Amino acid sequence: MNRRESIMELNIEEIMEILPHRFPMLLVDKITELVPMDYAVGVKSVTINEPFFQGHFPGHPIMPGALICEAMAQVGGVALQYPEENRGLIPMFTGMDKVRFRSPVRPGDQLVTKAVIKKIVGRMGKVHCECYVGETFKASADFLFYLAEPENKKEKDENNK
């Protein structure tokens, strides 16, 4: 199979099967490209109806940098769910490095994040993310993740002892 054939797309329902986040903290609407063990590209359509715009900032709404980082981390978390043996594990980010913001993200923007897997060792992973609106660079960061067992799986395992 060549690289082009391995590109996948995920809709919101498929993303919600992978990530535990829900509104208002689910910050990825769709995955437009996913190449297992390589990268994922995710999209967040930013609307004026986002709850954070009520206070950040009235009359001059911009997406908080912490939520831009969270959107990048969520795309990175999806990328780490492939290969198949990682499915069902919860991607928890354990660190951020080299965080850079270049220009604000505003209502009406379509925030596109590319998350490139740099390293996976056991259940630990490192992902480099960059996000854009159109051709305009918005932010980048390196994320460290741990792929954790879900709490309900731990409880099941303990009950089966």
Predicted stretch roles:
Residues 29-32, 97, 102, 114-118, ...:
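Conserved positions in beta-strands of structured domains
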Residues 28-29, 96, 126, 140:
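Hydrophobic residues on conserved beta-strands that form the core of alpha/beta folds
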Residues 23-63, 68:
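Catalytic strand-loop segment that frames the active site of acyl-thioester-processing enzymes
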Residues 31, 63-86:
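Active-site helix/loop of acyl-thioester processing domains in fatty-acid/polyketide metabolism
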Residues 1-33, 161:
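N-terminal leader/capping segments at the start of a protein or of a new domain
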Residues 16, 59, 101-103:
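Beta-strand-rich interaction surfaces with strong enrichment in secreted/lumenal proteins
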Residues 3-9, 76-112, 138-146:
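Hydrophobic beta-strand-centered segment that forms part of the acyl-chain substrate-binding groove
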Residues 7, 36-37, 106-109, 116-161:
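HotDog/MaoC-like acyl-thioester-processing domains
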